[in-house]
Structure formats: C-alpha cells, structure tokens
Amino acid sequence: MILITGGAGFVGSNIAIYLKKLISQSNITVLDNLKRRGSELNLIRLKKNKINFIHGDIRNTEDLKFKKNKISTIIECSAEPSVLAGTSDELAYLFNTNLTGTINCLNLAKQHNSNFIFLSSNRVYPYTEINKIKFFESENRFILKENQKISGFSLNGIDESFSLNGLKSFYGATKLSSELIIQEYSKSYKIKSIINRCGVIAGPWQMGK
C-alpha cells in the first residue's frame, strides 16, 4: 500500500491520481483531515479513480494505525501550507501539523519499514540570503544577473551548499526542522527517504485558502 497524507489536498490528490494511473493495480490510500477549504471537492476525483480515502489527522496517532495493510511507501504531503501561518492564532496548529505530524508519520514508517517521501519547501532558505540574489526586470519576467558571488547559487538555481542560516518564517522553520528529523530517522532506523524542496506549485484543482 502507498499512503499519501494530505492526499485530498491540491498536491496530494494529483500525486495519488497520477500514481493510480501509472500503477493501476496498486493500493493507493490517502489520509486527510479536510481542514483546508475545497479539499472535500477532491473526494469525488479520488473515488472515481478508485483511490481509498481515510478521514484522519496526522496529529492523532490513533488515526495512523494500519494493522491490516503493509505500507510500502509514505508520501507526506500534509501541511499547513501558508507562509503567513503563525501570524495569527494558528501557530499551535502549524507546529502540531508540520512538525509533530511529520514525526508521527516517521514513526509509522519505522513500524512498517516504509520508504518515506517528504514534500518540503523552498521556504527553508532564509529570505535574508535570497534577497541578496541580483536580477533585473524585463518586459515579461525577472532575469537573474550573471557572475553573482553567492555560495550555493548559480544561474542553474540553488544547490545544497546554499546557506540555511537566517530567518525564514514559522512555516519555513517547521519544514527545515522536519527535514533534520527525517535525516536522523533515516540514519538511526534505516528509513529510505527523499526530501523534495518544492517551489511554487500551481495547476488544476488548486483551491487557495
């Protein structure tokens, strides 16, 4: 079984449907708390593609008990995705979902010896460093300037040596913290893991806030 947390969201649902079409005989199961507005609209699409849905929350370990099915891979798409999260009274939800929830998913991966794929964010990079990147504005786009002496940055983008030190928002901090914990779990418990630092993602069935 492939478990996709946050699987009724924009990214999670599209991944689930893509995987089901790619490997039609596979058991694709999504888990989502349906908190984000519009996510319930994806349930029709998931059902149409014969994808199993579980109404659950990664903050609650009781919702992460899978005794009947062996989980081969967990794709962790669940998150409070707003960069503005934490500027209101949602700070506890942000931490409990983006950090504690990920730890709960890692413990599930440990129990099932599952592969673990984590959707992180380019928001792990500090905006103080990002703001040092020089560019100019053309008629229809921003164009990066050449010969910039910023460690980890080139016209090809940002690599692993780019600095992670500095302020990055509460959201970015939870994602970076999760990355570090994933690496520790991978080392200590031999969990095969992939961390994908996604940029701005847009497309069909994006519901917004």
Residues of each region from the PLM?
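Substrate-binding strand-loop-helix patch
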Residues: 202-209
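N-terminal Rossmann-like NAD(P)+-binding domain of SDR-like oxidoreductases, especially those catalyzing
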Residues: 1-199
